[in-house]
Amino acid sequence: MPKMKTKKSASKRFTARPNGSFKRGQAFKRHILTKKTTKNKRQLRGTQDVHETNLKSVRAMMPYA
């Protein structure tokens, strides 16, 4: 049986953690930032955990993570 392929788009967006969860970047921080408040932009910094409802699909896209 051949190896399973990793979805490259998923590997660029998600990072696996040792406990089995994944972290992801925040959306809504690319452009049209002038109408967003400073507080809103500050809260969009950093990373978030992938929600448990999406974990199954992320694990399927990254079988070796």
Swiss-Prot record:
GO terms for molecular function: structural constituent of ribosome. Residues 1-65 are annotated as: Disordered. InterPro entries: Ribosomal_bL35, Ribosomal_bL35-like, Ribosomal_bL35_CS, Ribosomal_bL35_sf. Residues 1-15, 26-44 have a biased composition (Basic residues). GO terms for cellular component: cytosolic large ribosomal subunit. GO terms for biological process: translation. Pfam families: Ribosomal_L35p (PF01632). Keywords: Ribonucleoprotein, Ribosomal protein. PROSITE patterns: RIBOSOMAL_L35. Belongs to the bacterial ribosomal protein bL35 family. This is Large ribosomal subunit protein bL35.
